[in-house]
Amino acid sequence: MNFKSLFLSFFLVFAVGLALVHAEETKEPRGPKITSKVFFDIEHGDKPLGRIVLGLYGKTVPKTAENFRALATGEKGFGYEGSTFHRVIKSFMIQGGDFTRGDGTGGKSIYGEKFADENFKLRHTRKGLLSMANAGKDTNGSQFFITTVPTPWLDGRHVVFGEVLEGYEVVEQIENVPKGPGDKPAETVKIVKSGQIKDESTKGSHEEL
């Protein structure tokens, strides 16, 4: 091999290496696909707090995401509008979705009273994640919670299916409301309006396993 061909070979390897590094640096962040977006307009007592926009991971957990989406729109004749956040624990989570009893003992899914855990591909790695509340294995209904800190002890027990896209400051306001017995807000924190936002799907910021 002469000097010219050796130089060309080296240059080719160098160029390919640079291209691979550039591709690694510029590729989109990994994350589950957000297939739909829903919103909650929140009031605390008579005071409007603002809007929370939630992105749902319909590719990773399609059944769970569809349940939440349909309950947010109320298209099945029942759903989240008018329900409350009945349990709020600072530096942990805010919980809602019990639109039948309002105390954490009720609620139902669009598939019947309960449905099975879909999968545990996603972990509770940060604040602002949307996950199913349950009473044990395969007891998902309509109740959900939004994390306000990482909660790794819930991994493998609760199905993560979305994230807060906008309005996390509203979540923080809910997290800090005065509470009474059972971590229930002293004044009602209500979802006064809910629905779906028609928008193009985007990537979430949660890493898939």
UniProtKB/Swiss-Prot annotation:
EC number: 5.2.1.8
Annotated S-S bridges: none
Subcellular location per the Swiss-Prot or TrEMBL entry: Endoplasmic reticulum lumen
Activity regulation as described: Inhibited by cyclosporin A (CsA).
One GO BP annotation of this record: protein folding
Residue segments, region Disordered: 179-209
Signal sequence, start to end: 1-23
Primary location recorded for the protein, binned into one broad class: endoplasmic reticulum
SUPFAM superfamilies: Cyclophilin-like
CDD domains: cyclophilin_ABH_like
GO CC terms of this entry: cytoplasm; endoplasmic reticulum; endoplasmic reticulum lumen
Residue window of motif Prevents secretion from ER: 206-209
Source taxon at top rank: Eukaryota
Gene Ontology MF annotations: cyclosporin A binding; peptidyl-prolyl cis-trans isomerase activity
Glycosylation sites noted in the Swiss-Prot or TrEMBL record: 140
Catalytic activity: [protein]-peptidylproline (omega=180) = [protein]-peptidylproline (omega=0)
Residues of the PPIase cyclophilin-type domain: 39-196
Key words, A-Z: Endoplasmic reticulum, Glycoprotein, Isomerase, Rotamase, Signal
Ranges of biased composition (kind: Basic and acidic residues): 196-209
Function: PPIases accelerate the folding of proteins. It catalyzes the cis-trans isomerization of proline imidic peptide bonds in oligopeptides.
Family: Belongs to the cyclophilin-type PPIase family. PPIase B subfamily.
Protein name from the UniProt record: Peptidyl-prolyl cis-trans isomerase B
Origin species: Aspergillus fumigatus (strain ATCC MYA-4609 / CBS 101355 / FGSC A1100 / Af293) (Neosartorya fumigata)
